[in-house]
């Protein structure tokens, strides 16, 4: 009798919520294809990036920003204008290609950050030596 009452109380209290809880916040990882370690002035390097989500929520939005702290160069998405350092740009796909063009005769280093609209953020660092 006690077991039946316990089961009934668990069943009835578990159905108190009217709304179904849907997980929206899924962590993600960035996968980057290998890039050359050396670049010469004026050379463009393709950087292939994939956002790998641990779950799927259709309303998840992703953005990218970057900052170059050594050397000089530009980073752009496809045929768009070069990104401005620390400005945020929306990403429309989970797989994308960035193009870094060296404008320096010394070593170059920069970081990119990809964020979602739930506060998750991943950083990837790149470093290129000068190629004569």
Predicted regions: what is each one?
Residues 8-32:
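Bacterial Sec-dependent N-terminal signal peptides
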Residues 1-2:
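Bacterial N-terminal signal peptides that target proteins for export
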Residues 24-132:
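First exposed extracellular module after export/assembly in secreted or surface-exposed proteins
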């Amino acid at each position: 009798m006690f077991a039946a009452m316990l089961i009934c109380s668990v069943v009835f209290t578990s159905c108190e919520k009217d709304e179904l809880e849907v997980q929206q916040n899924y962590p993600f990882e960035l996968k980057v294809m290998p890039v050359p370690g050396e670049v010469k002035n004026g050379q463009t390097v393709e950087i292939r990036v994939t956002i790998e989500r641990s779950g799927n929520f259709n309303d998840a939005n992703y953005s990218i920003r970057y900052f170059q702290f050594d050397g000089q160069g530009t980073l752009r998405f496809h045929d768009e204008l070069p990104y401005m350092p620390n400005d945020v740009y929306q990403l429309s796909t989970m797989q994308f290609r960035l193009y870094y063009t060296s404008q320096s005769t010394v070593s170059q280093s920069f970081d990119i950050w990809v964020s979602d609209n739930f506060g998750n953020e991943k950083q990837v660092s790149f470093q290129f030596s000068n190629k004569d």
